[in-house]
UniProtKB/Swiss-Prot annotation:
GO biological process: tRNA 5'-leader removal
Group of enzyme by EC: hydrolase
Recorded GO CC terms: ribonuclease P complex
Name the UniProt record assigns to this protein: Ribonuclease P protein component
Function: RNaseP catalyzes the removal of the 5'-leader sequence from pre-tRNA to produce the mature 5'-terminus. It can also cleave other RNA substrates such as 4.5S RNA. The protein component plays an auxiliary but essential role in vivo by binding to the 5'-leader sequence and broadening the substrate specificity of the ribozyme.
Gene behind the chain: rnpA
Leader sequence segment: none
InterPro entries for this protein: Ribosomal_Su5_D2-typ_SF (IPR020568), Ribsml_uS5_D2-typ_fold_subgr (IPR014721), RNase_P (IPR000100), RNase_P_CS (IPR020539)
GO molecular function, one term: tRNA binding
Family affiliation: Belongs to the RnpA family.
Reactions the enzyme catalyzes: Endonucleolytic cleavage of RNA, removing 5'-extranucleotides from tRNA precursor
Subunit annotation: Consists of a catalytic RNA component (M1 or rnpB) and a protein subunit.
E.C. designation(s): 3.1.26.5
């Protein structure tokens, strides 16, 4: 049976992990959210989240966006390529309801899978 846990090993934790992704990213985005990805040598995907207070004013909205993004990643982790991902929330993402945000994330994960197969 496939485990769908979200352990510490699946998270980008240090600034150097984020910098690694920002140096040469593959980009997939919508007007409200961008996912940057870069292949890693670990054999499994990892995720980091950036939701700036400048773009999403209210803490409960930032938390909702992060929670939905983590859940989307957790459910797709076994389908994703071994990449480090940084999810960047842009202005307007707080206006999306949960379903629209989940659908946008699914579309971006599929795009990253295609990009990884193509490289």
């Amino acid at each position: 049976m496939v485990k769908l846990a979200f352990p510490r090993e699946l998270r980008l934790l240090t600034p150097s992990h984020f910098t690694f992704v920002f140096q040469q990213p593959q980009r997939a985005g919508t007007p409200q959210i961008t996912i940057l990805g870069r292949l890693n040598s670990l054999g499994h995907p990892r995720i980091g989240l950036t939701v700036a207070k400048k773009n999403v004013k209210r803490a409960h909205e930032r938390n909702r966006i992060k929670r939905l993004t983590r859940e989307s990643f957790r459910l797709r982790q076994h389908e994703l390529p071994p990449m480090d991902f940084v999810v960047v929330a842009k202005r307007g993402v707080a206006d999306l309801d949960n379903r629209a945000l989940s659908e946008a994330l699914e579309k971006l994960w599929r795009r990253h899978c295609r990009l990884a197969r193509g490289s």
